[in-house]
Amino acid sequence: MTLTVTDLAIARGGIPVLEGLSFTLTPGRALILRGPNGAGKTTLLRTLAGLQPPLAGRIEGAEDKIAYAGHSDGLKPTLSVTENLLFWAAVFGGRDITPALEGFALGDLADRHAGNLSAGQKRRLGLARLLVTGRPIWMLDEPTVSLDRDAVAMFADTVRAHLGQGGSALIATHIDLGLDAEVLDVGPYRARPAPLDDPDGDFL
């Protein structure tokens, strides 16, 4: 499934942050999202994932195809690692959780409550949810936060496997994941500020 974005404009808190953005994301490809802090990367990912509406433009190919992993891991702290994955698997159609446990080395933590995990372990569990969604397009917002070097490599391998199976990924990160991916710099698409009112204009 190809994701096509055409002349997109988005806002954060009612203030436009990006405009005129167009790109395509085809199966088997990854796109790395770059730009300074506050440029609108998170807002873009949230908009593409359907969590907020765009100001203008078109998003095609996203219907029920996107899995989003943001800054919040979205875990149920009183449930075990296994129970968390089973919960999300049920939400997305009841997929086998074994690949998720194995892909992020969570087997030894399977019975531990999510609330008792370290920050890095929580992040791994949050990312493991991607593997039980069955959705082909991944939207990832700084996915390597709290991960050590081995876990970053594990994550990169998971993304490569996903791409190899015909999936795609849009990733906001400043870390070199070693992926064969193009870079989308949102800097040139930052919204122009609205012109200020001229209180003296009526007197000129």
Swiss-Prot record:
GO molecular-function term, one example from the UniProt record: ABC-type heme transporter activity
One of the Pfam families matching this protein, by short name: ABC_tran
Subcellular location field: Cell membrane
Record-listed ATP binding positions: 35-42
Any GO CC annotation of this UniProt entry: plasma membrane
UniProt entry keywords in alphabetical sequence: ATP-binding, Cell membrane, Cytochrome c-type biogenesis, Membrane, Nucleotide-binding, Translocase, Transport
Assigned EC number: 7.6.2.5
ABC transporter domain location: 3-204
InterPro entries assigned: AAA+_ATPase, ABC_transporter-like_ATP-bd, ABC_transporter-like_CS, ABC_transptr_haem_export_CcmA, P-loop_NTPase
Record-annotated membrane-spanning stretches: none
Catalytic activity: heme b(in) + ATP + H2O = heme b(out) + ADP + phosphate + H(+)
Gene Ontology process terms (BP): cytochrome complex assembly
SUPFAM superfamilies: P-loop containing nucleoside triphosphate hydrolases
Membrane topology note: Peripheral membrane protein
Protein origin, superkingdom: Bacteria
Known role: Part of the ABC transporter complex CcmAB involved in the biogenesis of c-type cytochromes; once thought to export heme, this seems not to be the case, but its exact role is uncertain. Responsible for energy coupling to the transport system.
Subunit structure, interactors included: The complex is composed of two ATP-binding proteins (CcmA) and two transmembrane proteins (CcmB).
Family the UniProt entry places it in: Belongs to the ABC transporter superfamily. CcmA exporter (TC 3.A.1.107) family.
Record protein name field: Cytochrome c biogenesis ATP-binding export protein CcmA
Lineage: Bacteria, Pseudomonadati, Pseudomonadota, Alphaproteobacteria, Rhodobacterales
Gene: ccmA
